[in-house]
Amino acid sequence: MRRALGTLGCCLALLLPLLPAARGVPHRHRRQPLGSGLGRHGAADTACKNRPLDLVFIIDSSRSVRPEEFEKVKIFLSKMIDTLDVGERTTRVAVMNYASTVKVEFPLRTYFDKASMKEAVSRIQPLSAGTMTGLAIQAAMDEVFTEEMGTRPANFNIPKVVIIVTDGRPQDQVENVAANARTAGIEIYAVGVGRADMQSLRIMASEPLDEHVFYVETYGVIEKLTSKFRETFCAANTCALGTHDCEQVCVSNDGSYLCDCYEGYTLNPDKRTCSAVDVCAPGRHECDQICVSNNGSYVCECFEGYTLNPDKKTCSAMDVCAPGRHDCAQVCRRNGGSYSCDCFEGFTLNPDKKTCSAVDVCAPGRHDCEQVCVRDDLFYTCDCYQGYVLNPDKKTCSRATTSSLVTDEEACKCEAIAALQDSVTSRLEALSTKLDEVSQKLQAYQDRQQVV
């Protein structure tokens, strides 16, 4: 894909001398020489700014790349990041690391500032072993260039770009995989270092090859390529020049521009003006139950009796009677998504519907005893008045009969008493007879004395 240059100053920046330590691809595919005046863009910077990209670096860390050389690659990545207009609405960057396996160091959605990206790059470790370049390109399509991983939708018209850095020959099939990637709209730049196979680089890269294939002799000068890529990604910045008609946000796009809106607004059909959106309108949010608008964005909440799940979208019914979730003094009874309080047996719920008080179990209406209620702590037993006995149901009473009041033991006692009483009576009668006889004899004696 041929790149339009923004201004005359930007064009002049391309025509710099060739570095002694680096050479271009073979003559029939030669690019403009790599410049020695790197980083000197002067006034061109004000009107020449890299256009928004979804940019993925795929770096070879196979066994042929020595540790000190891999550190040079990381320096190259950091310098590339410094030249980019990084941000959520501008250029997004991902880094993949490959050898015999592929590792996504960070996808497009992870970092939107240069400092965080460069810190993540500094922590990358080589994988060693083989050079599975085709596997890495396929992984970029399957695992990185997806909306879930931060790639912007097709209607945003943001270019998808891959920069592959390798020093060897691929050990797997790359031609078909690279062709599929290009067909999917991915622009591929191939950077060869040292022993890199030039034919493989040309097979991978997009057309025209003289704009998409780069070669340097050593990793020691790879960072010099940052200038070439900056020039490649440079576009006339209509947004910076202020010659656009966007109401809110202007986004540079491959020499042109697109209009966008602030968060909480949506672009109108005229593609220039914006209208505020109801982020909680049906179909605009992912909340399971309640959507709460929050400064152009939204947060999800749940109905009473439900709790928000870790995904911050869906809700689950909570156990409202779990410890710490209710204020019942004794018993919590779940009632749908709410609860009510109750009390243990022997207690009654107070008017506050939370606390409990002990009840008089023998108070009228609280027991089923027919005659006498006897309180026993929180419980009671029934009893009867004198002359009544408790029935087997332990509640009602029946009048006691005489026979039922005398036990066998008491009957024996009665017989013994009766016998004793008979014996005493008999003796008293005998004694009385004796006393009568003595009294008669005494009277007769007294009579005789009077006669004398």
From Swiss-Prot:
One of its GO terms (molecular function) is calcium ion binding. Residues 419-451 form a coiled coil. Disulfide bonds join C239-C250, C246-C259, C261-C274, C280-C291, C287-C300, C302-C315, C321-C332, C328-C341, C343-C356, C362-C373, C369-C382, C384-C397. Residues 54-229 form the VWFA domain. Residues 1-24 form the signal peptide. Keywords: Coiled coil, Disulfide bond, EGF-like domain, Glycoprotein, Repeat, Secreted, Signal. GO terms for cellular component: collagen-containing extracellular matrix; extracellular region. Glycans are attached at N295. It is found in: Secreted. SUPFAM superfamilies: Chicken cartilage matrix protein (SSF58002), EGF/Laminin (SSF57196), Growth factor receptor domain (SSF57184), vWA-like (SSF53300). InterPro entries: cEGF, ECM_Assembly_Org, EGF-like_Ca-bd_dom, EGF-like_dom, Growth_fac_rcpt_cys_sf, Matrilin_cc_sf, Matrilin_coiled-coil_trimer, VWF_A. It comes from the Eukaryota. Residues 235-275, 276-316, 317-357, 358-398 form the EGF-like domain. Expression is restricted to cartilaginous tissues. Major component of the extracellular matrix of cartilage and may play a role in the formation of extracellular filamentous networks. Can form homooligomers (monomers, dimers, trimers and tetramers) and heterooligomers with matrilin-1. This is Matrilin-3.
